[in-house]
């Protein structure tokens, strides 16, 4: 008897990718075969993203493609909270579940394509690390669900709820399994990594027989014992973040912080319902770099937020010149259904949003170009991501996968994905580095 086959598509950010991995791991444990071909599958699961309108449009398009090619489609993920919208566009979907409803997704799959009764999970073992959708040498490590912030442009709390931290022992045990399976880089993710443990008052859990506090600093210290790269994403600049800089300076955690500042104008930050301490943030960035000179700072910003004036925007550009961030993403404000910001006065015209976005990107490109040029001549560690006929492409400690730059490596000896090599940097541009392997 052949195993039932499930087609799967995962949309959205890394946090959604981790949800997809969890669903796929459960299905594989029950004997399902995962196939990339829709027309070869007994059912297709679409894990959607519903954060902004463009993501919703992409999700609806993906659902439509799956229906056209297969006909039997189950929808899950963030957009699942808008079941009426999905069914209005695609009334033939078999089931719709929301984010984090893993068991409901699996039950829906059972209803369409029941698992084999003769499946023996002890003979058809799933890898200890579970099913991963990333390359073998890096993996996302989700430490919590939900968020306690109520930013006016965001609907994540209404979709995913308040912050719920995973037990620290579970997180560290998963990290151990990943490292044993060959992972060389752990990317710590959540909606708010720096708030880890606040919902349970930072109570201690146990890992390898010893207590570990459920708190970002203690988690990072424990992860450093695994001997692989640990990269922190989605960190808010709370005071205790200063403690992690010491771990970075000591080489225990990658000197990389992904902090979603979103803006710099105090007036706009208040409208966004975000902390408006841009002057203190600049002072802290200066202290962080004094303690850890190799620190890389990444952030994302929104331009064209309702009420943003030219003065607010210029304030942001001036702040960027002072902050000298290394890696930056920027988005034009887009209304999100259900977000409080939709009701704010003085929306910014689309042509002004576009013009400000272009000026912002040009401004930051100059900063990025200058900062990367200082790396020429230095020796850095590079984790190889891919190799083809043109050479090897990897990342340094300053580069997260998918969102940051790359290091193009010239090597006389063959390389493969997952190799960690020493490289002397020979050239740079706005986003990337080039170098020669020296060890």
Swiss-Prot record:
Keywords: 4Fe-4S, Cytoplasm, Iron, Iron-sulfur, Metal-binding, S-adenosyl-L-methionine, Transferase. Residues 4-114 form the MTTase N-terminal domain. Binds 1 [4Fe-4S] cluster, which is coordinated with 3 cysteines and an exchangeable S-adenosyl-L-methionine. It catalyses: L-aspartate(89)-[ribosomal protein uS12]-hydrogen + (sulfur carrier)-SH + AH2 + 2 S-adenosyl-L-methionine = 3-methylsulfanyl-L-aspartate(89)-[ribosomal protein uS12]-hydrogen + (sulfur carrier)-H + 5'-deoxyadenosine + L-methionine + A + S-adenosyl-L-homocysteine + 2 H(+). One of its GO terms (molecular function) is 4 iron, 4 sulfur cluster binding. It is found in: Cytoplasm. Pfam families: Radical_SAM, TRAM_2, UPF0004. The keyword Transferase applies. InterPro entries: Elp3/MiaA/NifB-like_rSAM, Methylthiotransferase, Methylthiotransferase_CS, Methylthiotransferase_N, Methylthiotransferase_N_sf, NA-bd_OB-fold, Ribosomal_uS12_MeSTrfase_RimO, rSAM. This is Ribosomal protein uS12 methylthiotransferase RimO. It comes from Bordetella bronchiseptica (strain ATCC BAA-588 / NCTC 13252 / RB50).
């Amino acid at each position: 008897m052949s195993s039932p086959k499930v087609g799967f598509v995962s949309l959205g950010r890394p946090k959604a990718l981790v949800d997809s991995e969890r669903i796929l791991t459960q299905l594989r444990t029950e004997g399902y075969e995962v196939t990339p071909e829709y027309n070869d599958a007994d059912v297709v699961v679409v894990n959607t993203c519903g954060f902004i309108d463009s993501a919703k449009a992409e999700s609806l398009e993906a659902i439509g493609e799956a229906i056209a090619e297969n006909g039997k489609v189950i929808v899950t993920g963030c957009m699942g909270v808008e079941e009426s919208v999905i069914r209005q566009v695609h009334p033939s979907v078999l089931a719709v579940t929301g984010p984090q409803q893993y068991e409901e997704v699996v039950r829906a799959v059972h209803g369409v394509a029941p698992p084999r009764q003769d499946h023996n999970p002890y003979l058809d073992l799933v890898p200890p690390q579970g099913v991963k959708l990333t390359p073998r040498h890096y993996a996302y490590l989700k430490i919590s669900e939900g968020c306690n912030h109520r930013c006016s442009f965001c609907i994540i709390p209404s979709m995913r709820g308040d912050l719920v931290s995973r037990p620290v022992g579970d997180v560290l045990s998963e990290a151990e399994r990943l490292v044993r399976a060959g992972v060389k880089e752990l990317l710590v993710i959540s909606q708010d990594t720096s708030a880890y443990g606040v919902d349970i008052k930072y109570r201690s859990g146990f890992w390898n027989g010893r207590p570990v506090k459920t708190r970002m600093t203690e988690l990072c210290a424990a992860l450093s014992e695994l001997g692989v790269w640990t990269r922190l994403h989605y960190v808010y600049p709370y005071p205790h973040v200063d403690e992690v800089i010491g771990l970075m300076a000591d080489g225990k955690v990658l000197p990389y912080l992904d902090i979603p500042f979103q803006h710099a104008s105090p007036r706009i930050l208040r409208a966004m319902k975000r902390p408006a301490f841009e002057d203190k943030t600049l002072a802290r960035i200066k202290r962080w770099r004094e303690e850890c000179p190799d620190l890389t700072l990444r952030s994302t910003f929104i331009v064209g937020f309702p009420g943003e004036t030219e003065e607010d925007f210029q304030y942001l550009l001036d702040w960027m010149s002072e902050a000298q961030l290394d890696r930056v993403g920027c988005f034009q404000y887009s209304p999100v259904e259900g977000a409080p910001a939709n009701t704010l006065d003085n929306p910014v015209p689309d042509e002004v949003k576009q013009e400000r976005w272009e000026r912002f990107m040009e401004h930051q490109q100059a900063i990025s170009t200058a900062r990367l040029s200082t790396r020429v001549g230095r020796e850095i560690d590079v984790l190889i991501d891919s190799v083809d006929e043109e050479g090897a492409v990897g990342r340094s400690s300053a580069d997260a996968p998918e969102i940051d730059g790359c290091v193009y490596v010239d090597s006389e000896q063959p390389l493969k994905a997952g190799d960690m090599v020493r490289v002397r940097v020979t050239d740079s541009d706005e986003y990337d580095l080039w170098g020669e392997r020296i060890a």
